[in-house]
Amino acid sequence: MSYAVIVTGGKQYKVAEGEFLKIEKLEVATGESVTFDRVLLVANGDDVTIGAPVVAGAKVVAEVVSQGRHDKVRIIKFRRRKHHMKRMGHRQWFTEIKITGIQA
């Protein structure tokens, strides 16, 4: 089984071909292809290549499946003894992708 570790949106993801993944929002239309050049590691069976910091010539190709927003995260700011409470919420945008190929 081949897999790779990519960097996008300031996070690292372990990906394999055919896998669906929710990443930080990309400004790419649904159905289009996107290429990730920042590949930190590529493994194909027992053959593992680790980059310093990235693997030269390696790329991961994916197709954008959908754009959306995660569930709401609610927070409460509370000041004791002051009769003050503030409720807030946040919904982060995401891009769902399907990994179509790993090239090393």
Curated annotation (Swiss-Prot):
One of its GO terms (biological process) is translation. One of its GO terms (cellular component) is cytoplasm. The keyword Cytoplasm does not apply. Keywords: Ribonucleoprotein, Ribosomal protein, RNA-binding, rRNA-binding. Belongs to the bacterial ribosomal protein bL21 family. This protein binds to 23S rRNA in the presence of protein L20. This is Large ribosomal subunit protein bL21. It comes from Pseudomonas entomophila (strain L48).
